[in-house]
Amino acid sequence: IQPAPADVPDIIKNILVPINAQKGDLLPVSAFKGMEDGTMPLGTSQYEKRGIATHLPVWDSSECIQCNMCSFVCPHAVIRPYLLDEKEAANAPADMVLVDAKGPKMDGLKYTMGVSTLDCTSCGSCVSSCPKSGKALKMVPTHEVSLDQTGWKYLQTLPEKNDRIDKFTLKGSQLRQPLVEFNGACAGCGETPYIKLLTQLYGDKMYLANATGCTQAWGAAMPCVPYCKNKEGKGVAWSNSLFENNAEFSYGMCLAVKQLRAAVTEFVKQLDGMTKDAAVKAAIAKWFETYDDLDASSVATDELLAVLESTKFSAEEQAVVAEILKRRKDMSKKTMWMYGGDGWAYDIGYGGLDHVFAMGEDVNVLLVDTEVYSNTGGQSSKATPVGAVAQFQASGKKTRKKDLGLLLMTYDNVYVAQCSMGANPNQLIKAIKEAEAHKGPSIVICYAPCINHGIKKGMNNVQQEMKDAVASGYWNLYRYDPATKKFTLDSKEPTMPLYDFMKGEVRYASLELSFPENAKVLFADAEEAAKEKYEYYKLKSEG
């Protein structure tokens, strides 16, 4: 076994390196000391550095418009934009390309694009999604690119410029650190960009219950954990239970977090009634004012903790302060999310999902819909559309896709959105923001192309496939807000023939070869289903 560098954590030296060398069976039980309860350190994927790319993206700063779309769509968080102030730019490696940052609030800042070359999978999604594809970014054979990581390592030390950006924009979101990186998903994966975006918006305040399936396989393949922490040591509190109980598992997490916060709140109230210190009372007042505001609550909590740690109290007051400080991690508002695929949400875990939503708690779901059981090889699910070929549906699925969004709208308190990243990134960000802000259950259903679809143009065109799915009426974009009872249809009337979209994927095109008569009937039904669905949504949006 090739030894690990001396400056890496013990888990890398003692566990990751031996396992990746196919020597995991030789590990003694003592190697797992401290992990008896199943917990694992975050961020171990950054040490793998597999170096599997045959081609790498090379950035041309003179052609770049700094839209950050390349970073937005990257399935493995390999390509990222950075902002540098004058001092940081002066200390940067001499060969690092820096240009003036464009946009509001960017005065005095430099902009660069970093690529973690040893973590890239050569999918090419960045290049195919670039508005100036072939100019601002090009895929170049790996042997022609420097693999030196000095520049990348320097960029990881830089603080974020959060006061200069709006994280709820495509460009701004990508100037925040992704808290899931270098995962084990397929090259070009359609699932991972969604969860990466979610971590960039809320990752340092997020609890995540992950259903079994592909999202668990690439998110927790022992010993590689792609979920990581920011420079403050905060990251996604991630866990997985089973396929069939993820919603219930998340509900339990939600109730536990709620109870823990209620406990510390009682101590804060008690201190407020005891102390006469004006600074302490002001900090407590602000903490209560921002109690339900995710971002403001975090700031107010830090300010209150700073005041508590710097103020002299009486012995009686200090006893209460000690109880508060002991529970400091429970003080700020957290956001609760479930994450999984259609095999979980439409099928195996649907009963639990329905039950949890009926309870009315403030839980959120990010559902990546690949329309098959992806992790186990492409078996048909209730999300599989009519006419698609999948395992157990070799002659084409005879029934139409279950409309999970409409089913959940029958509850009067559930926020529902349907999104497709490549079709409308801004609608996706808006939906996630609205879902998190909704005081009750919410679900964001995301179209996620998969290798099981057999995209003829290749997995480097996943984002275009998302766009074509909407343009053809195969997939619709909408948002439903139960607070206002408003249904907003965000996709326009189809401009692309549905058949043109379907024939571009092997899961449909193969049916014409193996069962041509079935294809004729089922594709006609698919056309009718798409037309009916759009007309129904259109009527619903018109009130």
Language-model features: where?
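Short, ordered loop/turn segments at secondary-structure junctions
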Residues: L84, T142, V368-E371, M421, ...
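Ferredoxin-type iron-sulfur electron-transfer modules and their immediate structural context
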Residues: I1-C120, V127-M336, A388, I451, ...
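Alpha-helical scaffold segments in soluble metabolic enzymes
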Residues: M69, S125, K196-Q200, A263-E266, ...
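Thiamine diphosphate
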Residues: W218-G219, E317-S442, I455-S472
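A structural signal for short, well-ordered beta-strand segments and their strand-loop junctions
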Residues: P75, Y207-A211, L367, Q418, ...
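C-terminal, charge/polar-rich interaction regions
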Residues: V521-A526, K531-G543
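Glycine/aspartate-rich loop-and-adjacent alpha/beta segment that forms the canonical ThDP
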Residues: I1-A4, P223-V236, L428-N518, D525, ...
